[in-house]
Amino acid sequence: MKATLKIGSILVLLMLGFIAIVSAQSDRKANRDTREWRYEIEAMGTGVQGTYLIKVWTYSKRPDVAIEQAKKNAVHGIIFRGFAGKPGIPGQRALTNNVNLEQEKAEFFDPFFSDGGKYMKFVSITNDGSVSAGDRLKVGKEYKIGVIVSVNVAALRADLENAGMLKGLSSGF
C-alpha cells in the first residue's frame, strides 16, 4: 500500500514538472516572437492630452498571447516606429530618430520590455481585453489580433528622457 502511494506521488510530481516545463517553453516562444517585433499600428482617435489611442495588430499562434504582447508592441511602436494618420486623425513620428537605439541601449530596453516590465506603466487596453470578430484574423498558422490601446506618451517621453534614452524637447535650443 505504501509503495503504491509512493509511486503515485512520484508520478504526480513528474507530471506537474512536465507541465511547468512545457508552459515555460511556450512563454519563451511568445517572448521570442515579440522580440521580432512583428506588428502594425493604426491611429484610432485622439485620447486625453498626452495619450495616443491606437490599434495594434499583433501576430501570434495563440490569440491570448497576442493580446498581452500588443501592449509591448504599442509602446515599442511609439518609441521606435511611429504611425501613419488617417483622415481627421494625425499620425505621429517615433519618439527617437536613432534607429539603433534599442541595440545600443539593450541594457535598458531588455528589462524595460520584459514580462511585467516598466513599459506596463504607460499602456492600457481600452476594450477590457475583448477582441471583436473583425479584429481576430487567421493568417496561415497564426492569428493577427487587433487590440485598441491607450499609450501615455507624455509620461513615456519623460521617463525615457530621465533615463537618458531620449534628448529633452528643449535640448536643441
Pin down the residues of each PLM region.
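Domain-level marker for long, solvent-exposed, non-transmembrane regions
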Residues: 23-173
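Bacterial Sec-dependent N-terminal signal peptides
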Residues: 1-27
